[in-house]
Amino acid sequence: MIVPVRCFSCGKVVGDKWEAYLNMLQEEELDEGTALSRLGLKRYCCRRMILTHVDLIEKFLRYNPLEKRD
């Protein structure tokens, strides 16, 4: 779904780091741990928020509940 704005455990803002994280993985070809460290995510609870997020918003945008199926 949508990236959580804050860490569920400690409350640190993590939502603004998602785009930069994806950019580091794709363009700079860093591994996950290095990218998270460069973003300043030191606590394991905050790292978990980014590592375990599954971005499903694009799939849900294609779904139209009012569309009739034949």
From Swiss-Prot:
Principal place of residence: nucleus
Localization in the cell: Nucleus
Gene3D superfamilies: Homeodomain-like
Listed GO biological process terms: transcription by RNA polymerase I; transcription by RNA polymerase II; tRNA transcription by RNA polymerase III
Amino acids binding Zn(2+): 7, 10, 45-46
Cellular component terms (Gene Ontology): RNA polymerase I complex; RNA polymerase II, core complex; RNA polymerase III complex
Membrane spanning residue stretches: none
Subunit structure of this chain's protein: Component of the RNA polymerase I (Pol I), RNA polymerase II (Pol II) and RNA polymerase III (Pol III) complexes consisting of 14, 12 and 17 subunits, respectively.
Family the UniProt entry places it in: Belongs to the archaeal Rpo10/eukaryotic RPB10 RNA polymerase subunit family.
NCBIfam families for the chain: PRK04016.1
Protein name: DNA-directed RNA polymerases I, II, and III subunit RPABC5
Organism the protein comes from: Eremothecium gossypii (strain ATCC 10895 / CBS 109.51 / FGSC 9923 / NRRL Y-1056) (Yeast)
